[in-house]
Amino acid sequence: MNMKFYYENIDFKNVSNGYPFCHISNLDWNYGFSNPIFELNDVEPIIWNFSIIGEMNSQVVDANKDYLESVFDKVKDKPNIKIVFSNFHEGTNQNPFFSRLILFKDKFNLATNQIVVVTNNKHSELFNKHGIKVIHKPYLFGFLVDHYRDIKHTSIDYKGTEIGLLNVNQYLESEKKKFFLTYNKNTTKTFRIQLILWLIKNGLIDDSYVSILIKNNNFNKRELDSNEIELNGLAEYYDEFDKIGFNVLDWDYPNHKNDVFSNLKYTTKSHYADTYFNIITETSFENNSLNLTEKSFKAFANCHPFLIIGDMDTHKYLQSLGFELYDDLIDYSFDSMPDNQKRLNDALGQIRKVHKLGINSIINFYKNNIEKIKKNKERFFEYSFSKMIDDTIKELHI
């Protein structure tokens, strides 16, 4: 029997289910709009989808509790209807969101897997054992790949800036201007500030391309310090960080939030050509989340050595996606440390080690790993956001 998408509004192509906290998404465009239904029944397989705007967190549930309870009440005796919450772009710690859904499931006595969550967060798969069906795929990664296909072989020019992807020969042939590259759009996050303070403390800030686009002082500066070796005394350098102000590499976010460089495709090729190593700071840095955004994958497409400061088991997850790590350069034992401060400390220790190896050692490492680096780039382009959406729709039908 053909699966249908239930829509609350006759004007469903313009007004989403759950508006205004939800919007129309790829599930609608790729399937739902061609298979709509406007009345619920207890026979046909029906999807009632809510594509959440922003993070899937407890606040969005609490703010719309009465409405959501009315939704669950309508399907409590109809196991053929699946309530789906989907988000392909935001996936930071979703545990409180799932806790709310479990309460709803129990209150309305819903069937196992009648609630479905479609998410970018790998860690959320743990909630399958609580009767919530979790469909996880690296959607943001796939979204990046589909954008990068346009510049895979041919660069484009934007006001004198080359937008394109670096290859291994260009990495080796390009004259380097800095050792590190690190994009840090939002430096209100403690772990990103700690990285920049660490670069300042160790005299590496001037040998790094560092973007700083969002700042504020709404946090406890004492959280910047730790007894861990690499993190000790970082707060002393906060004033220097504050004096830096904003630092724009290409996307002038402070003045133009919708600048062309906000588009995923617009990658400044020279940033990768001019540097030896990429320090990637992910969106989240948790031990109960595993949310990789496009940030973790750009280095593969640009043939650039890297280390990610992110959620626990981030690098392990990359391996599960078919990428090879650089074990002859980096000790990844920090990756599985549940203590966030210890994980950050040891990651910084590895970054220090990479810098101490020196330029010649990094180039030799690169030459010895060219086939691996090429293979990772090929693996990158084997993924596709559109295929992930098609596979998701198939899984919803099961």
Protein language model features and the residues they cover:
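Pol beta-like nucleotidyltransferase catalytic core
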Residues: 2-280, 286-293, 300-398
